[in-house]
Design a protein with these regions (language model features):
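Acidic Gly/Asp/Thr-rich repetitive segments characteristic of extracellular carbohydrate-active
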Residues: 18-49, 53, 59
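Right-handed parallel beta-helix
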Residues: 63, 87-98, 113-124, 139-155, ...
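Extracellular beta-strand-rich solenoid/capping regions of secreted or surface-exposed proteins
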Residues: 49-61, 70-114, 127-136
Length: 166
């Protein structure tokens, strides 16, 4: 009975910890910076062009708030610090058009929990969608599900280039 109670309490506590936060292109950066582990940023339709750093110690979901009009991501995700550890990003229901050669480009980042791309349209990838460049660390999971990938440029090197162990 105690075990059952404890499990229920922990499940409820973890559920209450995650928050859904509505954002637009103007409020996105502050919400992303202040998001906690498990938080879901509900992106209103618009173009999001402010680059972000890969999260550390938390997994953040960027999800479309609209079922009919996809928010457009036109930024990159970067990281260059081995202190960035055990973070994750989930992209759900977005149109992703990378602004540079890479969409996710992390050089000296430690272990990554997960990168998930769900229900997204990915287009105009210039060189590589995910690039990691730090041997000896790992990515727990890379997942693409129900995505449309199109119009990738002729400069394309390869879609995924992880030096992390996957």
């Amino acid at each position: 009975m105690r075990t059952h109670f404890l499990l229920c309490f922990l499940f409820l506590f973890s559920y209450l910890g995650a928050t859904e936060i509505s954002v637009d292109p103007i409020t996105f950066n502050d919400a992303y910076t202040n998001a906690g582990d498990g938080d879901v940023l509900l992106l209103e339709p618009g173009i999001y062009a402010s680059s972000v750093t890969f999260p550390s110690g938390k997994t953040i979901t960027l999800k479309s708030a609209s079922a009919t009009e996809l928010p457009e991501i036109r930024f990159g995700v970067s990281g260059n610090d081995e202190a960035i550890m055990n973070g994750g990003l989930i992209f759900d229901g977005l149109k992703i058009v990378p602004s540079g050669d890479y969409f996710i480009s992390v050089d000296k980042v430690g272990d990554i929990a997960a990168i998930r791309v769900l229900n997204c349209t990915i287009e105009s990838v210039n060189r590589c969608f995910i690039r990691t460049n730090n041997n000896g660390y790992s990515i727990g999971e890379i997942e693409f599900a129900n995505c449309i990938i199109r119009n990738c440029g002729d400069k394309g090197w390869n879609f995924l280039y992880p030096k992390h162990i996957v």
